[in-house]
Design a protein with these regions (language model features):
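Phosphopantetheine-dependent thiolation modules in NRPS/PKS and related acyl-activating systems
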Residues: 1-73
C-alpha cells in the first residue's frame, strides 16, 4: 500500500523522493493536486475519502493508515 501511495505522490509532485513522514503540502502539494490525490487514492483502493481528512493524515504513512481505516469499515 505504501509503495502505491508513494507512486501516486511521485506522479503528482515535483519532488520525486519522499520520506514516509514528509508532509504532502511541504512537498509541493496544493488544493488542486489534493483533488487529484484524492481521486487516485479512491480509485486505487476502492474507498471514499473527504478532502478534509488529508489535513489529519498529510504524510505517506498517515495516508496509508487512513486507507487501512477506510478499507476496514
Amino acid at each position: 500500500m505504501i509503495e502505491k501511495i508513494m507512486a501516486i505522490w511521485s506522479h503528482l509532485l515535483p519532488n520525486k523522493t519522499f520520506d514516509l513522514n514528509a508532509n504532502f503540502f511541504d512537498c509541493g502539494g496544493n488544493s488542486i493536486l489534493l483533488a487529484y490525490l484524492q481521486w487516485h487514492l479512491e480509485k486505487s483502493f476502492f474507498i471514499t475519502l473527504s478532502a478534509i481528512e488529508f489535513f489529519s493524515y498529510p504524510t505517506i504513512a498517515g495516508m496509508a493508515e487512513l486507507v487501512a481505516l477506510k478499507r476496514s469499515t
